[in-house]
Amino acid sequence: MTDPTSIKHQTTLTSGTSADFTQAGEPFALFAEWFAEASKSEPNDPNAMALSTVDADGLPDVRMVLMKGYDADGFVFYSHKASQKGQELAANPKAALLFHWKSLRRQVRIRGLVTPVTDAEADAYFATRPKQAQLGAWASKQSQPLESRFAFEQAIAKVATQYIIGEVPRPPGWSGWRITPVRMEFWHDRPFRLHDRIEFRREAAGQPWTKVRMYP
């Protein structure tokens, strides 16, 4: 095991804009700016985000998912309703997200309420997925035990015979969720761990944001 005391402390600031992000007055515009920069600098998946939910016993779960859209209403991702995350969100529609862009030494933390996307939204996104991914969505019983990789490949092949010609429809148990933030925190690395942290807070969607500077 690596001795954490042997790791050299980072004392220089690397990538990122020189603009003072602490002057931002609204979080979504700032997120858009940071995400655009991350899209240019991250080696892969700048839209990857850690999604945290809580089960019936209050035990948290976290996993990486891909953000598939965002706007002033929130951040959207897709998955199976019967998955562990889907069941936990159905029982407790609150979640936290974390974007970590290592190339920029930045992270964005988000907390908020979760609502399902509309069928029209889910259909539109599903239609953009590669056909093999669409077939996989039909074949997968996400979060359930799987006998073997071969069994999964057989299930995909079986589904494929049903959709040799034409479009693959969205499975009824596959959809998306939108996380509408009530908290958005922007963190940027600074030398000697004297980082910058700005949090935007509001009581509910549609309410005005309050900006607070936080100790690192």
From Swiss-Prot:
UniProt EC number: 1.4.3.5
Cofactor binding comment, as recorded: Binds 1 FMN per subunit.
Reactions that this protein is recorded to catalyse: pyridoxamine 5'-phosphate + O2 + H2O = pyridoxal 5'-phosphate + H2O2 + NH4(+); pyridoxine 5'-phosphate + O2 = pyridoxal 5'-phosphate + H2O2
InterPro entries: Pyridox_Oxase, Pyridox_Oxase_CS, Pyridox_Oxase_N, Pyridoxamine_oxidase_dimer_C, Split_barrel_FMN-bd
Binding site for substrate: K68, Y125, R129, R193, L194, H195
Family the UniProt entry places it in: Belongs to the pyridoxamine 5'-phosphate oxidase family.
Protein name: Pyridoxine/pyridoxamine 5'-phosphate oxidase
Organism encoding this protein: Bradyrhizobium sp. (strain ORS 278)
